[in-house]
């Protein structure tokens, strides 16, 4: 086929002769017509490589003599082992099990009544309540009014809880709803490519009313996944189906994700979510304990908050483990539960938390590594921008992540509290003004600190 040969020669110039010989010329042409080319890959790895590196190029540049695009259909050849199994199955008049996608399960306790709303998160909470039809507002926001809805915030800010709460509410109304983590979506793409079942994949993701995707920042560097999600997004959006996304960072701060996807993420409404403060954490614990039919003593709630500081997820995990282990361990009385007994029951989780807990020293070290300077430079007296900006950022993170008093931060950095307040205010102002450099560095450092 002349058009295919011309395309391969163009790829030899772009990718190199050896790469094309290894990955493209070994594809077997099954059949072709004016607008379709059917290829067979020798194995799933070759098919996946094609999807990652060539599919997008072929859609743009693979055309026939009439300047019309030629669609490539790719399947995977049967290996001898697979062929043997197929032969045996046919002999026994058996049939191959249908290709199926397994979606993420919804946490039954992630419901709107158990979400602790704060002043900062009120808009996001209210919007999703309206979409779910659970708001007392007379003129409520309907599905599709904002499309997509993009929620972002650090770990433990409530993104997953809100998404799952909405999924529960909409499913109860009889709507076809998919909640999926970005990692699961990626697994589905890879599995479907390997099985030659992309049509099943597309039908599963497009024959729905609402799509909720958690952790979309995970799409970073995944070319085939981004390509498939781009087309899934377009199809659903054109049909007026609601799309709701969640991520650890705003669309502008997403790393290594195609600009065309980033721009689509901003088409609707982008809403930030803030983690709970220590006082609000107690309300969260009490509400969660109530959902578990467990009366949590306040002294134990305060101990859990003091112990599991990394994020709300770690805190809830600690509570759930405590409730389960209390029910399994007859030695401890729920009514007379002590801090000592709680510590004994959760010792493994406490040790795990201590390994990952953020400390002022870890913050200073992470900032120094990010800027390529020494920790002594951050703690020293130098006023050059190379040292002053990292120092201000470290102070801001100590205040934001650890809720350290200004006086205590001043003692750590050998500065008076007014200097610390000025430094923290300077970074906060940059973040409020959407300084992409500062916000991007903050995001990278927090990712390192949170493992």
From Swiss-Prot:
Q: Which GO terms describe its molecular function?
A: ATP binding; ATP hydrolysis activity; DNA replication origin binding; lipid binding
Q: Which Pfam families match?
A: Bac_DnaA (PF00308), Bac_DnaA_C (PF08299)
Alphabetically sorted, this entry's keywords are: ATP-binding, Cytoplasm, DNA replication, DNA-binding, Lipid-binding, Nucleotide-binding
Annotated region (Domain I, interacts with DnaA modulators) at: 1-68
Q: Where is this region: Domain II?
A: 68-104
CDD domains noted in UniProt: AAA, Bac_DnaA_C
Where it mainly occurs, coarsely classed, is: cytoplasm
The yes or no answer to whether the keyword Cytoplasm is present is yes
What does the UniProt entry say about where the protein is found?
Answer: Cytoplasm
Question: Where are the residues of the annotated region Domain IV, binds dsDNA?
Answer: 327-451
Note the coiled coil stretches, chain numbering: none
One Gene Ontology cellular component: cytoplasm
* Source organism superkingdom: Bacteria
UniProt key word Cytoplasm: yes
Region described as Domain III, AAA+ region: spans on this chain:
105-326
Binding-site residues for ATP, renumbered to this chain: 156, 158-160
Instruction: Give GO BP annotations, semicolon-separated.
Output: DNA replication initiation; regulation of DNA replication
Q: How does it assemble?
A: Oligomerizes as a right-handed, spiral filament on DNA at oriC.
Q: What does the similarity note say?
A: Belongs to the DnaA family.
* Domain comment quoted from the record: Domain I is involved in oligomerization and binding regulators, domain II is flexibile and of varying length in different bacteria, domain III forms the AAA+ region, while domain IV binds dsDNA.
Q: Which NCBIfam families match?
A: DnaA, PRK12422.1
Q: Name the job this protein performs.
A: Plays an essential role in the initiation and regulation of chromosomal replication. ATP-DnaA binds to the origin of replication (oriC) to initiate formation of the DNA replication initiation complex once per cell cycle. Binds the DnaA box (a 9 base pair repeat at the origin) and separates the double-stranded (ds)DNA. Forms a right-handed helical filament on oriC DNA; dsDNA binds to the exterior of the filament while single-stranded (ss)DNA is stabiized in the filament's interior.
- What is this protein's record name? Chromosomal replication initiator protein DnaA 2
Organism expressing this protein natively? Protochlamydia amoebophila (strain UWE25)
